[in-house]
Design a protein with these regions (language model features):
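Beta-strand elements of well-folded, non-transmembrane domains
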Residues: 26-28, 39-43, 73, 88, ...
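Short amphipathic beta-strand and strand-loop transition segments with alternating hydrophobic
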Residues: 22-28, 109-117
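Surface-exposed extracytoplasmic segments
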Residues: 113-130
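Solvent-exposed loop and beta-edge segments used for protein-protein assembly and interaction
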Residues: 16-18, 27-33, 61-63, 76, ...
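Beta-strand secondary-structure signal
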Residues: 23, 34-38, 68, 123-127, ...
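Acidic/polar low-complexity flexible segments
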Residues: 2, 58-65, 73-79, 136-179
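Order/disorder boundary and secretion-linked terminal/linker segments
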Residues: 1-52, 58-60, 159-179
Length: 179
């Protein structure tokens, strides 16, 4: 088990929210991934939807505030994208290679996670049992990111690292956590 804290950085060209801090913590315990996102700062400047009574699998969650996770097995081109809405909605996509062969991952029919909000802190916690998609002895490259929508309608892109001229969470060179 290794517990790894990280701080996400806004994409340089985006209209960053200077007082917002997005930290993450990721742990792999056997074949369970434990991920926690913490947003601190002026949350009143962000569009954070309230928790839905009926969280569901949905597409295009990144058009609003969305917390994201990318998992790629070492020595392989394929990877998974996890999208998590503060409203409780979610989706998991599998890609054969960089942005190619996208399909919803059928191994998951639900993805429960916990959200909590206080005046200046929002937290999302998730445990993913990965046995359905990845063997326990498989090493992973992981990318953690977020799309944050402001009350002014602007979307900002946050990630562990930005390696291109445009924000692109799918780039394998941004999957910098080794688990």
């Amino acid at each position: 088990m290794n517990n790894r804290p990280f701080l996400l950085k806004p994409f340089p060209a985006s209209a960053a929210l200077p007082d917002l801090k997005i930290s993450t913590n990721i742990t792999r315990r056997f074949n369970t991934l434990i991920v926690q996102y913490n947003l601190t700062g002026p949350l009143e400047e962000l569009v954070i939807p309230t928790l839905s009574d009926r969280p569901a699998r949905k597409n295009n969650l990144w058009e609003e505030t969305c917390l994201e996770l990318f998992l790629g097995p070492d020595n392989s081109d394929h990877y998974w994208e996890f999208n998590l809405s503060p409203a409780g909605h979610w989706n998991i996509y599998h890609f054969r290679s960089y942005r190619k062969g996208i399909r919803e991952e059928p191994a998951f029919t639900s993805l429960p996670f916990i959200v909590s909000r206080q005046e200046d802190t929002f937290q999302l916690s998730l445990e993913i049992g990965m046995d359905k998609i990845i063997p326990a002895d498989q090493s992973l490259a992981v990318g953690v990111s977020a799309v944050i929508k402001s009350i002014y309608g602007e979307l900002t892109c946050w990630a562990l690292i930005h390696t291109g001229t445009e924000a692109d969470f799918h780039r394998r060179d941004t999957f910098i956590i080794e688990l």
